[in-house]
Amino acid sequence: MQVLETISDLREYRKNVKESVGFVPTMGALHKGHQSLIERSLKENFHTITSVFVNPTQFGANEDFSAYPRPLEKDLALCEKLGVDVVFVPKISEMYPYKSEQRLKLYAPKFLSHSLEGAMRKGHFDGVAQVVLRLFHLVNPTRAYFGKKDAQQLLIIQHLVKDLLLDIEIVPCEIVRDSDHLALSSRNVYLNAVERKQALAIPKALENIQQAIDMGEKACEMLKKIGLEILKNLEVDYLEFCNHKLEPLKIIEPTNTLILVAARAGKTRLLDNLWV
């Protein structure tokens, strides 16, 4: 496995690769969710490149950029064990050669980015668009793998690829959960034992909503009440029912409904969702 830190080294590697390339962009602190993305890429491509880059432009002023976990040696060991070909670990100065005021500005499409996470974290998806498009430009992958847990991010990236005519297949991958059903996240390490137990209300709420849908309930208002009752001991930022354009729904639309939740257990903000 090669660990590349510079754009010039990555370009030199990529220039000599003619077969299919799978790409798994990450911010590190890898867990079994990331592992599932890497394993799928390894199955579907001749070469797999993973990036580890904590992207400063997607963090807000009061967010945890400096505190974000960075266990690089552990991440590299996992990638090598899995059989990754290249891990790209650039410095901020590599990815952003100009100061903020000198950069070309990229903006995520407002119709997908203004609500939900975009409303809670101003500029977050603009930062995601900045880094993902830069990485796509450098890696030029055949396929790129993203988890469904960050559903709004996934929809935005799918839109950007189509809108900018990029020849990249975006592969959505299922949410990976721990044995207690909590969706895997790098931020789960912040939870103490009590908070983790409280956080289990999030997958429980989604499970109960799914059960109600299976029993015939289609009214989003009623389903939301079911979910909020289970989430009552958490600080809920939102529990919303949308179609795949993130437009609010009143009635469940089969194969075109996303149920998204963001809530805090202690100080840790957690996301989860259900694709119906």
Swiss-Prot record:
It holds the Pfam family Pantoate_ligase. Beta-alanine binds at Q58. ATP binds at residues 27-34, 147-150, 176, 184-187. GO terms for biological process: pantothenate biosynthetic process. InterPro entries: Cyt_trans-like, Pantoate_ligase, Pantoate_ligase_C, Rossmann-like_a/b/a_fold. It catalyses: (R)-pantoate + beta-alanine + ATP = (R)-pantothenate + AMP + diphosphate + H(+). GO terms for molecular function: ATP binding; pantoate-beta-alanine ligase activity. Pathway: Cofactor biosynthesis; (R)-pantothenate biosynthesis; (R)-pantothenate from (R)-pantoate and beta-alanine: step 1/1. Its main location: cytoplasm. (R)-pantoate binds at Q58, Q153. Gene3D superfamilies: HUPs, Pantoate-beta-alanine ligase, C-terminal domain. Keywords: ATP-binding, Cytoplasm, Ligase, Nucleotide-binding, Pantothenate biosynthesis. One of its GO terms (cellular component) is cytosol. It is found in: Cytoplasm. Homodimer. HAMAP family: PanC (MF_00158). This is Pantothenate synthetase. The lineage of its organism: Bacteria, Pseudomonadati, Campylobacterota, Epsilonproteobacteria, Campylobacterales. The gene is panC.
